[in-house]
A protein has these predicted regions:
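TPR/TPR-like alpha-solenoid repeats
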Residues: 438, 472, 506, 523, ...
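Conserved structural position within tetratricopeptide repeats
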Residues: 423, 453-457, 487-491, 522-525
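Polytopic membrane enzymes that build or remodel cell-surface glycoconjugates and lipids
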Residues: 1-475, 498, 502
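Residue-level detector of alpha-helical secondary structure
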Residues: 377, 487, 517-520, 535-539
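TPR/TPR-like (Sel1-like) alpha-helical repeat modules
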Residues: 501, 505-530
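Boundary/linker segments of alpha-helical solenoid repeat arrays
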Residues: 429-430, 463-464, 495-499, 525-537
């Protein structure tokens, strides 16, 4: 084994150890929050024979405008390798996060030939607490896979071309297209890999255009185009024209879908400043920013928006420093292009803000921070500069590591997560409603009702929260109010269909079997046999 290979394997071990130390406790965690989608689709995801069907399925719902077959396929392999328990899913997330850090090291080292910079970038990335949601929340795997496969595409792109009888063999460059397809098939935000790759090539070649570079990278570009065509072709077939480029969501997930461009951009810039702040100073991390935790802003001249504009402007300027400062340019490009697909600046997306969305762009932040530490460390003739750089990194490692470790604990159970979310997002209808639901499940009707009424005060349009409040009234014996709330939960554009079952159960409780069957027929899309079996099982259990 060569010394080079030993060194790489040793650093891979360091990455695995760091991730295990920070997030190992999540192996004891449950399926929480959005992870429930994995459990609800277990019959499909756990069946290897259904793998081809996943290529024709949207990511949970068609209206969301999401198509992520690679992420869905990863859940299938998870079921096959580690069973249906959450520990196996958490283990794979940890493994993928560590591998992503290792690939970051390989990329930075290959591109800039600066090993210390590569070490620092990878370690800072692994330590950043803003990644806790993407790593500890199983559903955050989409973020990890999108970056991981993008890194593999970049590494494939940077391979030295191999001549073939005086020309270039197109077959040698197929990995670039495959990795890009897998990246975008994991999450759409990996489209950012394209402009980042352009900046990367410029940083490597030190020239914007030449005939030699054109032919050098043409095969990889051709395969990348093929990968894109394959993904977008499948996306169109699955989502159709209506949702191909559009995400339809509710006011709860993203109120910016329901305002004009001006307030949307003003608010989005304020949110960009929040992302930047929480990447560097990760106190007050939160799993939820739903309505109305981040109110829509209408005044451009507020501190958050102006800071966000400054961050955006500096990132744009930084990209154009590619000739004079290629490392800064690449860091700016990753940060800028990594954020734009989810930033709500040019178009509204499916969510107003989520810390998991910082996973890809935070690589740019990590590279920039590592560059600063590296420059201090190599300051000539100043031994104190080296001590300062080491001290700063050690302080960051302890600070970021401690916050990441503590934050990972919030994701162990839904009760802990929802309590944490209600504390950091007290104005979110989703957080207050979820906390109320956790109290309800624990049998604490007083606090459940208090939280669910508080959620309704924030926004009387969240169907699941209204349904949960109906459950509380049902438990209290107020069937009239419970029935009214269940019906209200079904009256929205995005109804909560579980309310049909609750209405059926109330009817059965009152002895109205025929009425219960009607509600169940609506729940099961007219499937009379399933409705009859449900009623029969209920009556036999009495």
């Amino acid at each position: 084994m060569s010394a080079e290979l030993k060194q790489k394997l040793m650093f891979l071990g360091i990455c695995l150890a760091a991730v295990s130390l920070l997030y190992g406790r999540t192996l004891a965690g449950d399926f929480v929050f959005d992870d429930r989608g994995i459990v609800e689709h277990q019959a499909l995801l756990s069946n290897l024979n259904q793998l081809d069907k996943m290529l024709t399925l949207p990511y949970w719902t068609e209206e969301a405008g999401l198509y992520r077959p690679i992420t869905l396929a990863s859940y299938t392999f998870n079921y096959l390798l580690f069973g249906s328990g959450p520990a196996g899913f958490h283990f794979v997330n940890l493994l993928l996060h560590a591998l992503t850090g290792f690939l970051i090291y390989l990329l930075v080292d290959k591109l800039f030939k600066r090993r210390l910079l590569a070490y620092l970038t990878a370690l800072i990335f692994l330590l950043l607490p803003i990644h806790s949601e993407a790593v500890a929340n199983i559903i955050g795997r989409a973020e990890i896979l999108a970056l991981l496969f993008s890194l593999l595409a970049f590494l494939s792109l940077l391979k030295e071309p191999q001549p073939n009888q005086g020309g270039l063999n197109l077959k040698n460059y197929w990995p670039a297209g495959v990795w890009l397809f897998l990246a975008i098939g994991s999450k759409e935000t990996a489209i950012a890999a394209l402009p980042i790759a352009a900046v990367m090539i410029y940083a490597k070649e030190k020239i914007f255009w030449s005939r030699e570079n054109f032919y050098k990278y043409l095969p990889a570009a051709a395969w990348s185009a093929a990968g894109l065509a394959a993904y977008f072709g499948l996306r169109f077939l699955v989502l159709g024209g209506e949702y191909f480029l559009k995400s339809v969501t509710s006011m709860v997930e993203n109120p910016l879908q329901f305002v004009s461009a001006g307030p949307r951009i003003i608010t989005a810039l304020n949110i960009l400043a929040l992302y930047f702040k929480k990447s560097f100073w990760p106190l007050g991390l939160c799993s939820d920013y739903s309505y109305n935790q981040l109110p829509v802003l209408h005044n451009f001249f507020n501190a958050g928006t102006l800071i966000g504009l400054a961050v955006l402007s500096l990132a744009v300027v930084g990209v154009f420093l590619v000739r004079r400062a290629p490392i800064i340019s690449l860091a700016a490009a990753i940060f800028l292009f990594g954020f734009l697909p989810t930033a709500n600046l040019f178009f509204p997306t499916g969510t107003i803000m989520g810390e998991r969305l910082a996973y890809f762009p935070s690589l740019g932040f990590s590279l920039l921070l590592a560059y600063g530490l590296n420059e201090i460390f190599k300051f000539r003739g100043k031994i104190m500069a080296k001590y300062l750089a080491v001290g700063l990194f050690a302080a960051l490692a302890v600070f970021y590591g401690a916050v990441s470790f503590l934050r990972a604990g919030d994701w162990l159970t839904e009760k802990r997560l929802f309590a944490s979310a209600a504390g950091c997002a007290p104005l979110s209808v989703l957080s207050r409603s979820n906390l109320g639901a956790s109290y309800y499940l624990a049998g604490d009707l007083v606090n459940a009702k208090k939280e669910l009424l508080a959620a309704r005060e924030i926004y009387d349009g969240y169907p699941k929260g209204i349904n949960n409040l109906g459950l509380v009234y049902w438990k209290e014996g107020d069937l009239k109010t419970a029935r009214e709330l269940f019906l209200k939960a079904l009256s929205f554009k995005f109804p909560y269909y579980g309310a049909y079952e609750n209405l059926a159960l109330i009817s059965l409780e009152e002895g109205k079997v025929k009425e219960a069957r009607l509600w169940l027929m609506l729940l099961y899309s007219g499937d009379k046999a399933t409705a009859d079996n449900y009623v029969e099982a209920y009556l036999n259990a009495e």
